[in-house]
Amino acid sequence: MDLQHQTFHNKGCDIHYWHKSSSSADYVIFLHGAGCDHRMFASQLPIFGESYNVLLWDARGHGLSKLQHNQTFSFEDMIDDFLKLCEKYQIANAILIGQSMGGNLAQEILFRKPNLVSKLILIDCTRNTGKLTLSEKLMLKLSKPIFYCYPWQTLIRQSAEACGNDEAVKAYVRNCLAQMKKKDFIDVMMSLMTCLREDEAYRFPKPVLLLCGEDDRSGNIRKIVAPWADSDANCTLLMIEKAGHNANQDNPTAVNKAIASFLTTP
């Protein structure tokens, strides 16, 4: 796929993104997970051929979209980046495909701008509006000091092990994280908590495909995904065999088949 590498500046950060135009007005926008970059969706691009305009990015603080020395990652700034990108291309309706952090961002965009989204595909991400147990709330409060206790190389290695089953996926994650500073990674993880709000009455107003690796060991994702799907008539769940947290990389064949089928569903 012929992707054009471009940048735009917003809130002190040069955001790098990749764009492919088509004759269609339909857009699909890929949103990667924390610590990763746009390359994690390489195996999904062939699904879309010439039928869609495609956008991928390196979210601020990730990949080529480096933060300035005195900057701190903010989930709210990332939302603003996304909306600026949509404004730049006058996007009025898009399919969002988000993995982990990207899925949290996609949920928040649908919550705030429902008319901007036609469908969501959420890969191995937690529920923004889910109810947390007391132990989960405690772990969130303790996570920052725990992260800082870990040597950076140990944190990189353990994060990579949690993300993938396939050795190539683990190597990719290690490569991405090695380009970040420990403080920046921790800032990203802590900022993600700002999108969590308990609202058990909330239901998605658009069709949503939930994909989860059967071996996902990250947070509470595997535990909550089935009840999440059961509670929302707009959700369709598929567990992905032989896949960890980065299910779209561990088992792209199964993920691509599920996405292609979902795209044709009214």
Outline where the language-model segments fall.
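Conserved HGGG/HGGXW glycine-rich cap/lid loop of the alpha/beta-hydrolase fold
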Residues: 13-67
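Active-site loop/oxyanion-hole signature of alpha/beta-hydrolase fold enzymes
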Residues: 55-97, 257
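Catalytic histidine-centered segment of alpha/beta-hydrolase-like enzymes
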Residues: 243-252, 256
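Conserved alpha/beta-hydrolase catalytic His-Asp/Glu region
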Residues: 131-133, 149-203
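Gly/Ala-rich beta-loop-alpha elbow adjacent to hydrolase catalytic centers
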Residues: 98, 102, 106
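Alpha/beta-hydrolase fold catalytic core
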Residues: 1-29, 51-52, 92, 260-266
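Conserved loop-alpha-helix segment in the C-terminal half of the alpha/beta-hydrolase fold
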Residues: 209-243
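Flexible "cap/lid" loop of the alpha/beta hydrolase fold
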Residues: 107-111, 118-147
